[in-house]
Swiss-Prot record:
Residues 253-263, 284-302 have a biased composition (Gly residues). The modification Phosphotyrosine is found at Y81. Signal peptide: none annotated. This is Synaptophysin. Residues 254-304 are annotated as: Repeats, Gly/Tyr-rich. One of its GO terms (molecular function) is GTPase binding. Its main location: membrane. The chain crosses the membrane at residues 26-49, 107-130, 138-161, 200-223. Residues 1-25, 131-137, 224-313 are cytoplasmic. Glycans are attached at N59, N99. The calcium-binding activity is thought to be localized in the cytoplasmic tail of the protein. It is a multi-pass membrane protein.
Length: 313
């Protein structure tokens, strides 16, 4: 019954959660950050390596042909030692050189906190979306935290890359042999048998810089949620209004409607010039070619001039 109740609670949370945010860049990048942070601290924090060398003395009874030296995270190599024959008496403790714990632990610490923050931010995106966007405080805090983690990834990855290079130098059997006094005595022979495998540590550095890329890239997506980019995002200019043509495109004062237009209604209308009337007979008071026609009243002759040529004659 308790298991069923827990399942109901989980189902309610899933039903109320906005899992679509995982498909968006903001949530999807957080998933990648969460996964890559796991790989970063796992490949570094769980490392353990081993190197092997041999010391062949002139006195064969004093030789040691299989010397194993183990070391691990956090790489306090100055505390790692092995017993090497002196070819003359009792074996002697020889310590490795260097303490590279600071860069390694710093890298792992940043990775762990980035993992925790990514998990918490992702849960906030899914189940507390309204609280996240309330008063725009959530996106602003998220942006600041993302910027801090991006900077921390840059510093920690660079420091750990340098630290790893020093670890490789300090655990190289050839360099260890160079520091052993017994190997420089005549008749003694020292050989390296196996180098430590550091491919896992190389992978941790790669994941460190991949996390840097993810966190820097995520700054843009979080920045858009803050609303700070709104003043810089100008709306595209609207389409310019169409200017009316002269005379309203043959509408108001153009073809066929205005008092000075060129339409068929005014060109040959009653206010025009020569207007013969073929339908009525010529008379003294009508139209046509008579004395009171268009030449007299509305024709080309001015008002007050003789209305017919016969009167002038």
């Amino acid at each position: 019954m308790l298991l069923l109740a827990d399942m109901d609670v989980v189902n309610q949370l899933v039903a109320g959660g906005q899992f679509r945010v995982v498909k968006e860049p903001l949530g999807f990048v957080k998933v990648l950050q969460w996964v890559f942070a796991i790989f970063a601290f796992a490949t570094c924090g769980s490392y353990s390596g081993e190197l092997q060398l041999s010391v062949d003395c002139a006195n064969k009874t004093k030789s040691d042909l299989n010397i194993e030296v183990e070391f691990e995270y956090p790489f306090r190599l100055h505390e790692v030692y092995f017993e090497a024959p002196t070819c003359q008496g009792d074996p002697k403790k020889i310590f490795l050189v260097g303490n590279y714990s600071s860069s390694a632990e710093f890298f792992v610490t940043v990775a762990v906190f980035a993992f925790l923050y990514s998990m918490g931010a992702l849960a906030t995106y899914i189940f507390l979306q309204n609280k996240y966007r309330e008063n725009n405080k959530g996106p602003m805090l998220d942006f600041l935290a993302t910027a801090v983690f991006a900077f921390m990834w840059l510093v920690s990855s660079s420091a750990w890359a340098k630290g790893l290079s020093d670890v490789k130098m300090a655990t190289d059997p050839e360099n260890i042999i160079k520091g052993m006094h017994v190997c420089h005595q005549p008749g003694n022979t020292c050989k390296e048998l196996r180098d430590p495998v550091t491919s896992g540590l190389n992978t941790s550095v790669v994941f460190g810089f991949l996390n840097l890329v993810l966190w820097v890239g995520n700054l843009w997506f979080v920045f858009k949620e803050t609303g700070w980019a709104a003043p810089f995002l100008r709306a595209p200019p609207g389409a310019p209004e169409k200017q009316p043509a002269p005379g309203d495109a043959y509408g108001q004062a153009g073809y066929g409607q205005g008092p000075g237009g060129y339409g068929p209604q005014d060109s040959y209308g009653p206010q025009g010039g020569y207007q013969p009337d073929y339908g009525q007979p010529a008379s003294s008071g009508g139209g046509g070619y008579g004395p009171q026609g268009d030449y007299g009243q509305q024709g080309y002759g001015p008002q007050g001039a003789p209305t017919s040529f016969s009167n002038q004659m």
